[in-house]
Amino acid sequence: MLEITSHRNGEILNYKHGRETADALMIEVRGIADPQSRVTVNGLPALRCDREFRAEVPLKSRINTVTASAKDKFGERTQSIVLVWDKGSFKRYAVRIDDNCFFLTDLARQKPARLFDHFYLKGLKSLHEKYGSKFILKCFFRNDHDEAKFTLDQVPSTYRNEFEDNADWLHLAFHALAEFPDRPYQHCTEERLAHDYDMTMNELIRIAGKKACTPPTNVHWAMLPPERFHVLRERGVKILTSSGFMSNRIYVDGKVEDLKGGSCDIGFFYEQDVAHHMLAKRCFYDPDHDLFLSRSFFCFNIDTPAEIESKIRQEDAAAAATGCEMMEAVGHEQYAFPHYENYLPDYFERLETSCRVPAELGYKPVFFQDGIFGNPAWGK
């Protein structure tokens, strides 16, 4: 018998979980083993009390392996787990807006004199100027709401300099080929995902320049088989975010209902043990695929301003126990546009609440793709 019980494989730790110095994060690793066995942790003897053991372990790298070993007359058993040191962690938030294609359609057809003459981008810039917020806009290649089926190759490169001049707070990224069908990559081939990604990103880079383009932090509907993750990793993706994992939000008779019965299928096919960890702590590292996971907990085109503020403050209060110092605001572009059938007149009020409340609580705006959820302590 041997089991590390204090930490789980893939857990992300910071100064709240131990004693941090410039060189290491000192943590206490605890577990259980047969009383007669001799236990070591990373080669050093552990303190014993009946079945329990404990040992102080320094985490010195971004990714660390902790190995417990129990040896007795029947042989030796070992357990190794991977732990991440979120060095120099700080409170931070990101804003991700999915399903972007309407504003790009307008740029191509309305041809505003300046990029931020467009109301949508003007609204984002106003929030950046007010709160310092940073936005990643996940884009479709095709606009399925347009009768002529607009595609990105119709957008001129006229605004490239403006995009690049504002790349410190505004990024464009791949989301999917188009909005429909739903769950486009749930059972896709490698070739399909690679084709859609490369075609979309090539156009975005042409439109906005490399400086203003970034690898995405998820794909449309947050559904992708793990055997396809490498397609994204090979293109620089480091993080997968989703509001699912352990929470199914559905519409029934015009109302939102939360189903907590099991792991959510909108969560990249991760199993329940990961889903339960994400529900409690919101972040995780998958050592099998070298990917970080983040669970978002509200959507500003579903939740009202009051609900958004309440959820953010609740999650911030919970961080005292979980140690999680990052959060993500998530929404969708189309609800900002009056011609969309589900237009929300208070769209920018909801989005402003998503930026204002974290700022009031001391969270700094970041891009999750930079470092560990926006923490560049180990480099980008």
For the regions a language model picked out, list residue spans one by one:
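Long, low-complexity serine/threonine/glycine- and acidic-rich segments characteristic of extracellular
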Residues: L2, S6-G10, M26-W85
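Short, solvent-exposed loop/linker segments at the N-terminal edge
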Residues: I12-A24
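Active-site beta->alpha N-cap acidic-glycine motif
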Residues: I81-E162, C213
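An acidic- and aromatic-residue-enriched active-site/binding cleft used to recognize and process polar
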Residues: D98-N100, F140-R142, L177, V219-A222, ...
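Well-ordered, non-membrane alpha-helical segments in soluble/globular domains
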Residues: K111-L124, K149-R160, E190-N202, P305-D316, ...
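Metal-dependent polysaccharide deacetylase catalytic core of the NodB/CE4 family, i.e.
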Residues: G132-E227, N248-V252, C324-F337
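Active-site-adjacent pocket scaffolds in enzyme catalytic domains
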Residues: E147-T151, K211-A212, W221-E325
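C-terminal domain-boundary segment and adjacent tail
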Residues: I239-G244, G323-K380
